Curated annotation (Swiss-Prot):
The glycine cleavage system is composed of four proteins: P, T, L and H. In this organism, the P 'protein' is a heterodimer of two subunits. This is Probable glycine dehydrogenase (decarboxylating) subunit 2. It is an enzyme of class 1 (oxidoreductase). The lineage of its organism: Archaea, Thermoproteota, Thermoprotei, Desulfurococcales, Desulfurococcaceae. GO terms for molecular function: glycine binding; glycine dehydrogenase (decarboxylating) activity; pyridoxal phosphate binding. It comes from Staphylothermus marinus (strain ATCC 43588 / DSM 3639 / JCM 9404 / F1).
Length: 521
């Protein structure tokens, strides 16, 4: 029986009392004072009033966050089968290495000669990611997946700008099964988004694609395998069509876990690809990061006369090895690069996780990762495809790659029990829910992804719970609409929780809204 803790726990800012301390900074020794001249901060840079931080003891902090973890759920508690998120186990050895003081105490403004070990790690990671994706050069600069996408879009923009054709290259084509960040990234990059529909088989409708490709096409963004878990079989032909109008093909690496070691985006004809280190390569993610979204490119010549290559457009810094000096260096083509998109080199900690993950597994191990992930998903399909109330659009007997999208539309039509109700029913039994209502082309969608980390036994239990939910929905639908009862938080008012007037992602925003509402603080 699953029962989650339910604490009436205030926010950390609401805890504590004036004068309470968790840590007292010791006075420096006399010898230290003599050498550095004391540790007093100059008055001219002191705050005029103390920061608005809670004054709490160490034990209060420990108890507070322990209670919060008891009311939460993550990959350490159990599988998190969120589709297109690749929530795999985060190896502890990678945590140990990334937390080593020889890494986390480095400063980005240190002399390059003093961080040669770190630069060597980043240099090797660049090469490995280029090899895995079939690209030629990588920048580790972008901070996350959508950041990597935006980098790729800016590279496409710069490419056409350097070729003096940006005035007419105004459109980015995106399939209707794409991640929502794709059209957002393209729009932020100044392009018009042109949506192309999926065909009856779930892949891109080739005739529809041909009808929208033209002289205004700047590029196409695609995830392969798609959010439906289907491999885009026409990808080589798509590449030829886009390149035929001097467009660039962009690979969203969110679903790389479904093909890693078997095929590579570069071999399919892609010019640019981003990689989610926090998905495919075992770094933690969720709660806003930190993630890492390296972007890689083929070594495509842009302008022979000026000797400009696609690699010159990469953001931030790349690490290169100088054979003459035997040193690793950070380089950036300031003249043609799309520039810095964040401070310094990138999010180093998740990059160290990714480096460790690849180093541990090797090429054979990475291939096995994909094999196991694909096998897990297809085993799950075999268990649920005939359960009453669920459908698998685009062919329930077709093999998928890393994930599958179930539809609870038959269940909803028959009983009124929705995909959201199904998700709540899973939560009520201690299972994490899949991604729901996405992709938009599947009604009452339940996008489910079991990574290589999961066991047969757990997948079977998950399928059994989906069967139980179906049985209850058809016999007592009102009961199904009451879930969850066993979780820390029960049903919430979705509209109120997401409304701009009530949404407060931070304490400061919350206090500002309280002040405005009650005209006092």
């Amino acid at each position: 029986m699953f029962r989650q803790s339910r604490w009436d726990e205030p926010l950390i800012f609401e805890l504590g009392n004036k004068g309470r301390k968790g840590f007292i900074v010791p006075e420096p020794e006399e010898e230290v004072k003599r050498k550095v001249g004391g540790i007093r901060i100059p008055e001219k840079i002191l705050r005029k009033k103390p920061p608005n931080l809670p004054e709490v003891s160490e034990v209060e902090v420990i108890r507070h966050y322990t209670r919060l973890t008891e009311m939460s759920y993550g990959v350490d508690n159990g599988p998190v089968p969120l589709g297109s998120c690749t929530m795999k186990y985060n190896p502890r050895i990678a945590w140990e290495i990334s937390n080593d003081y020889r890494i986390n105490m480095l400063h980005p403004l240190q002399d390059e000669r003093t961080i040669q070990g770190l630069l060597e790690i980043l240099y090797e990671l660049q090469k490995w990611l280029a090899n895995i994706t079939g690209m030629d050069y990588c920048s580790l600069h972008p901070a996350a997946g959508a950041h990597g996408e935006f980098s790729g879009i800016l590279i496409i923009r710069k490419y056409h700008e350097l070729k003096k054709q940006l005035d007419r290259k105004s459109e980015i084509i995106i399939p209707d099964s794409a991640h929502g960040t794709n059209p957002a990234s393209a729009s932020m990059g100044g392009f018009k988004v042109v949506e192309v529909p999926s065909g009856e088989d779930g892949n891109i409708d080739m005739e529809a694609l041909k009808s929208v490709v033209g002289e205004s096409t700047a590029g196409l963004m695609i995830t392969n395998p798609s959010t439906l878990g289907l491999f885009e079989e026409n990808v080589v032909e798509i590449s030829k069509i886009i390149h035929g109008v001097d467009g660039l093909l962009y690979y969203d690496g969110a679903n790389l876990n479904g093909i890693m070691g078997y095929t590579r985006p570069g071999d399919m004809g892609f010019d640019i690809a981003h990689i989610n280190i926090h998905k495919t390569f075992g770094a933690p993610h969720g709660g806003g990061g930190p993630g890492a979204g390296p972007v890689c490119v083929k070594d495509k010549l842009i302008d022979e006369e000026r000797n400009i290559w696609l690699r010159d457009l990469l953001p931030g810094y790349r690490v290169v090895y100088d054979e003459k000096t035997g040193l690793y260096k950070l380089v950036n083509n300031e003249k043609y690069s799309i520039g810095l998109l964040k401070a310094f080199f990138g999010n180093i900690v998740p990059l160290i996780w990714g480096y460790t993950y690849i180093l541990m597994l090797g090429s054979k191990g990475l291939r096995t990762v994909t094999e196991q992930a694909v096998l897990n998903t297809n085993y799950f399909i075999s268990l649920v495809k005939d359960i009453r109330g669920y459908d698998i659009p685009y062919g329930k007997d077709r093999y998928r790659k890393h994930e599958v999208v179930l539809s609870a539309k038959p269940l909803y039509d028959d009983t009124g029990v929705s995909a959201e109700d199904v998700a709540k029913g899973l939560l009520d039994a201690g299972f994490y829910a899949p991604t729901i209502y996405f992709p938009l082309i599947v009604h009452e969608a339940l996008m489910t992804e079991f990574t290589e980390s999961e066991t047969i036994e757990y997948i079977e239990k998950y399928a059994e719970r989906l069967q139980e939910i179906s049985t209850i929905a058809y016999s007592d639908p009102e009961k199904a609409k009451e879930w969850p009862l066993n979780t820390s938080v029960r049903r919430v008012d979705n509209v109120r929780a997401n409304h701009p007037k009530t949404l407060a992602p931070t304490w400061r925003i919350y206090m500002e809204k309280v002040c405005r509402k009650y005209s006092e603080c």
